């Protein structure tokens, strides 16, 4: 499904969810790697369309820049067993099929981030997409987004999904849970 099919599907699914089941105050958008980029593209598209946004977002090792200009793609090539420039180039070609890699719907790092919900970004120091995550953090912060960046020492791409055997991943899952609870159940955290 070439660009923008995934984003169109995500918009349809989110709008259906909010209409039929859960108010956005109880909804969190999350994604990892390309899914993290898609989650961010969804948020920026919803905001641009004037839709109500979810309560928060969680982005794990987000791939948010399909121009592939991040230095960490090369600097961390020997440290990240899951992500390679060659693999990402292949994915960009298949997904964009000649479309502009700077299009905000494909590379949400280039989108207007103002007005987005509180966002948790998790990335490892050995992740080839480290620069995508840190640049996103900086741009989101400058746009006024309440963003939290967790850069885990010596962790690689998508490390939080390895919670069955990696203690650092279990800590990340706990952090994600606390973040989600804090933003979806505010009455549970009141001091009154």
Feature map (PLM): residue ranges:
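Alpha/beta-hydrolase superfamily serine-hydrolase fold, recognizing
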Residues: 1-192
């Amino acid at each position: 499904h070439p660009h923008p099919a995934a984003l169109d599907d995500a918009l349809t699914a989110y709008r259906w969810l909010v209409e039929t089941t859960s108010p956005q105050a109880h909804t969190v958008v999350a994604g990892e790697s390309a899914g993290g980029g898609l989650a961010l593209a969804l948020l920026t598209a919803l905001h641009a369309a004037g839709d109500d946004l979810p309560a928060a977002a969680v982005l794990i090792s987000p791939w948010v820049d399909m121009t592939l200009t991040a230095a960490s793609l090369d600097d961390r090539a020997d440290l990240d067993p899951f992500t390679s420039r060659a693999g990402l180039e292949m994915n960009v070609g298949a997904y964009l099929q000649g479309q502009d890699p700077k299009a905000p719907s494909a590379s949400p790092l280039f989108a207007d981030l103002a007005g987005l919900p509180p966002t948790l970004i998790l990335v490892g120091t050995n992740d080839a997409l480290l620069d995508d995550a840190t640049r996103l953090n900086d741009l989101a912060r400058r746009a006024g987004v309440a963003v939290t960046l967790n850069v885990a020492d010596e962790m690689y791409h998508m490390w939080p999904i390895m919670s069955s055997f990696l203690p650092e991943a279990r800590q990340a899952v706990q952090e994600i849970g606390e973040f989600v609870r804090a933003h979806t159940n505010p009455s549970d955290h009141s001091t009154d």
